[in-house]
């Protein structure tokens, strides 16, 4: 999950250089402590505001909401994403065309997305237009005009999008991975919904979803950039009168449960095999979350377009980057609020079971190494790579705004980057070994494949290999 740091244009080159060089004179932690710090304000109604003024000429201001497909059921699956799409279609105050014209006039962009556990609506604009942006955000979130004709038009668009998504094999694969690993729980549901649920979502269901989920205690307004220092007072002006009264029951997440399982969708018209294997990971604020992130970095990723794998930083890439017919290889660590997925995704020719089994044997060998033999030198290298990716990705207003909002939604608190850096520094080889031993060794796997799956690795043998690590 991308984490990004917003710094002023004047500070950014110096910060990047100092972080990369990590000189003894100035520590990374000291550099980060000198960067702009985020401030958190909570309004009387529980609506939270986080601002980070970095003095830049632009700003990102958005509202992140604790909602998404994990709050849905099979009958209304896709309703959160459906509602998010309608936010762009006008309000009682601003028709769709007027909203678009108003944004264009100030050179602003309105964007939104829905994930399994959050919806975000945000605007990128000039620093001088921050109040206008907060006004627009409040209008689209509070006064969406859910007209029947607009809903029907968007329903058609969503069904087309759903059909087109079948061609995005990685997206299909990760939806299948959630469906297999979290079967019987709302985390198994796709954000997009299904061809059965979308046609039956009514205007009343959309209205009730907005009333139940767009409540102040479930929302965070996050602003990063220039001109955002007074956003907390603007939030009080435009969101301070929102109530926490629920006409129905308070939305809650049902308990999670991970199930070791296998699911294959064979389609020989797809030229390759797309595969993913994962154990249950940990929640965002779990004590082992950072250690698993660094372990994830240690294994790394590779693509066939890369010039070489023999000198790669990743041991796994060195072993199989040019063998076994691999086209793409990516280790992943997904964190939700209370659970996650830790595993490997790869694309391969899959002509031979020995090749595909060899891939998983190599992955299991790396997991074994991390659990029993990871060295301080290896972990230090992985931490440096993790830092580079982290701080590069934290350089835009938009991604830093998302990071700040997610911290509050998932943990109720906000870590400054200097605090996060201090936590990274504390992760040593022992912490990585213990985290992998606790969460990966002898754990059940969810295994899914799409495409040419005839040579899919044998599940029983792969699972048995998870408990043969210790000498």
Curated annotation (Swiss-Prot):
<dbReference type="GO" id="GO:0004222">
    <property type="term" value="F:metalloendopeptidase activity"/>
</dbReference>
<dbReference type="InterPro" id="IPR050361">
    <property type="entry name" value="MPP/UQCRC_Complex"/>
</dbReference>
<keyword id="KW-0249">Electron transport</keyword>
<keyword id="KW-0679">Respiratory chain</keyword>
<dbReference type="GO" id="GO:0005759">
    <property type="term" value="C:mitochondrial matrix"/>
</dbReference>
<dbReference type="Pfam" id="PF00675">
    <property type="entry name" value="Peptidase_M16"/>
</dbReference>
<comment type="similarity">
    <text>Belongs to the peptidase M16 family.</text>
</comment>
<dbReference type="GO" id="GO:0046872">
    <property type="term" value="F:metal ion binding"/>
</dbReference>
<dbReference type="InterPro" id="IPR011765">
    <property type="entry name" value="Pept_M16_N"/>
</dbReference>
<keyword id="KW-0496">Mitochondrion</keyword>
<protein>
    <recommendedName>
        <fullName>Cytochrome b-c1 complex subunit 1, mitochondrial</fullName>
    </recommendedName>
</protein>
<keyword id="KW-0813">Transport</keyword>
<dbReference type="Pfam" id="PF05193">
    <property type="entry name" value="Peptidase_M16_C"/>
</dbReference>
<dbReference type="GO" id="GO:0006508">
    <property type="term" value="P:proteolysis"/>
</dbReference>
<dbReference type="InterPro" id="IPR007863">
    <property type="entry name" value="Peptidase_M16_C"/>
</dbReference>
<dbReference type="InterPro" id="IPR001431">
    <property type="entry name" value="Pept_M16_Zn_BS"/>
</dbReference>
<dbReference type="GO" id="GO:0005739">
    <property type="term" value="C:mitochondrion"/>
</dbReference>
<dbReference type="InterPro" id="IPR011249">
    <property type="entry name" value="Metalloenz_LuxS/M16"/>
</dbReference>
């Amino acid at each position: 999950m991308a984490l990004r740091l917003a710094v002023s244009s004047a500070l950014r080159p110096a910060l990047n250089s100092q972080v990369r060089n990590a000189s003894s004179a100035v520590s990374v932690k000291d550099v980060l402590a000198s960067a702009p710090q985020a401030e958190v304000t909570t309004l009387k109604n529980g609506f939270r505001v986080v601002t980070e003024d970095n003095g830049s000429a632009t700003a990102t201001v958005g509202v992140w909401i604790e909602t998404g497909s994990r709050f849905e059921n099979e009958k209304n699956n896709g309703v959160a994403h459906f509602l998010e799409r309608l936010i762009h279609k006008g309000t009682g105050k601003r028709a769709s065309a007027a909203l678009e014209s108003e944004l264009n006039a100030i050179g602003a962009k309105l964007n939104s997305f829905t994930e399994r556990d959050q919806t975000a609506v945000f605007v990128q604009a000039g620093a001088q237009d921050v109040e206008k942006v907060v006004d627009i955000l409040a209008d689209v979130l509070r006064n969406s005009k859910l007209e029947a004709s607009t809903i029907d038009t968007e329903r058609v668009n969503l069904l087309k999008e759903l059909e087109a998504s079948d061609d995005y094999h990685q997206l299909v694969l990760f939806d299948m991975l959630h469906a297999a690993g979290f079967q019987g729980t709302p985390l198994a549901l796709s954000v997009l919904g299904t061809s059965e649920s979308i046609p039956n979502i009514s205007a009343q269901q959309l209205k009730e979803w907005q009333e139940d989920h767009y409540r102040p205690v479930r929302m965070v307004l996050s602003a990063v950039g220039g001109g955002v220092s007074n956003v907390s007072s603007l939030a009080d002006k435009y969101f301070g009168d929102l109530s926490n009264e629920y006409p129905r029951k308070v939305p809650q997440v049902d308990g999670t449960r991970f199930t070791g399982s296998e699911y294959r969708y064979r389609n020989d018209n797809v030229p390759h095999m797309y595969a993913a294997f994962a154990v249950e990971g940990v929640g965002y604020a779990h004590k082992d979350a950072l250690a698993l992130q660094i372990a994830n970095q240690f294994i790394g990723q590779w693509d066939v377009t890369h010039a070489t794998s023999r000198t790669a930083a990743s041991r796994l890439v060195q072993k199989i980057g040019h063998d076994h017919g691999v086209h793409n290889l990516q280790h992943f660590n997904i964190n939700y609020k209370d659970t996650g997925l830790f595993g490997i995704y790869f694309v391969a020719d899959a002509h031979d079971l020995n090749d595909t089994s060899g891939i998983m044997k190599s992955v299991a060998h790396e997991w074994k190494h991390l659990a029993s033999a990871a060295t301080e030198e290896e972990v230090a290298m992985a931490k440096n790579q993790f830092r580079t990716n982290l701080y590069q990705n934290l350089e835009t207003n938009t991604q830093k705004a998302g990071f700040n909002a997610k911290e509050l939604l998932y943990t109720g608190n906000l870590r400054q980057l200097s605090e996060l850096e201090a936590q990274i520094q504390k992760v040593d080889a022992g912490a990585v070994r213990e985290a992998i031993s606790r969460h990966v060794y002898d754990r059940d796997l969810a295994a899914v494949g799409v495409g040419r799956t005839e040579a899919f690795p044998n599940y029983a043998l792969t699972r048995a290999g998870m408990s043969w690590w210790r000498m």
